[in-house]
Amino acid sequence: MLVAQSFSAINPGPTAELYLGDIKSVMLTQEQIQARIAELGAQIGHDYRDRSPASDQDLLLVTVLKGAVIFVTDLARAIPLPTQFEFMAVSSYGSSMSSSGVVRILKDLDRDIHDRNVLIVEDVVDSGLTLSWLLRNLATRRPQSLQVCTLLRKPDALRANVDITYVGFDIPNDFVVGYGLDYDERYRDLPYIGMLDPRVYQQ
């Protein structure tokens, strides 16, 4: 398992001209993200290379829409093994800023995952409540293995004990956007991960 990289302070950096003024500072640059994804892909490839010998047993990457779509695409290209994609859409009751852990499925998987090696790919784990529910739900479908890879984890926000095998970065409990992460469906297209200026979501 790769050791997650902790960031104790926000690293200021240039912001793209998109959404000028909305991004308070840059936490992770595009270069940092891509370098870490390359490391994660290599480690996942090493760990799974003897688990998926048959073409119909390619590593199955399960992603919850929409935040991790960019991450899972880049991660799949960094894994030196054949991979397949599956997507779920879930709604977690709670405020726009936090999850209650009460989840309903809006879109389920399109195939049976029985006896498959499944890797859940997340953009960010904060409370861990939704992920904890998802792990329990998918475990009932009897995959051969079930593990988690997340780009970001917020240790200070965790409220559920979830086992995460692959962590890109441990970050402070700040509101971040970019590289797939959004606020009100905006900012997903930023190439970096930045702190959103509080004035944007406190209006």
From Swiss-Prot:
Its cofactor is Mg(2+). GO terms for cellular component: cytosol. This is Hypoxanthine-guanine phosphoribosyltransferase. Pfam families: Pribosyltran (PF00156). It comes from Mycobacterium leprae (strain TN). Pathway: Purine metabolism; IMP biosynthesis via salvage pathway; IMP from hypoxanthine: step 1/1; Purine metabolism; GMP biosynthesis via salvage pathway; GMP from guanine: step 1/1. It comes from the Bacteria. The active site is at D126. Its EC number is 2.4.2.8. InterPro entries: HGPRT (IPR050408), Hxn_phspho_trans (IPR005904), PRibTrfase_dom (IPR000836), PRTase-like (IPR029057). GO terms for molecular function: guanine phosphoribosyltransferase activity; hypoxanthine phosphoribosyltransferase activity; magnesium ion binding; nucleotide binding. Mg(2+) binds at E122, D123. GO terms for biological process: GMP salvage; guanine salvage; hypoxanthine metabolic process; IMP salvage; purine ribonucleoside salvage. Belongs to the purine/pyrimidine phosphoribosyltransferase family. Purine salvage pathway enzyme that catalyzes the transfer of the ribosyl-5-phosphate group from 5-phospho-alpha-D-ribose 1-diphosphate (PRPP) to the N9 position of the 6-oxopurines hypoxanthine and guanine to form the corresponding ribonucleotides IMP (inosine 5'-monophosphate) and GMP (guanosine 5'-monophosphate), with the release of PPi. It is found in: Cytoplasm. The keyword Membrane does not apply.
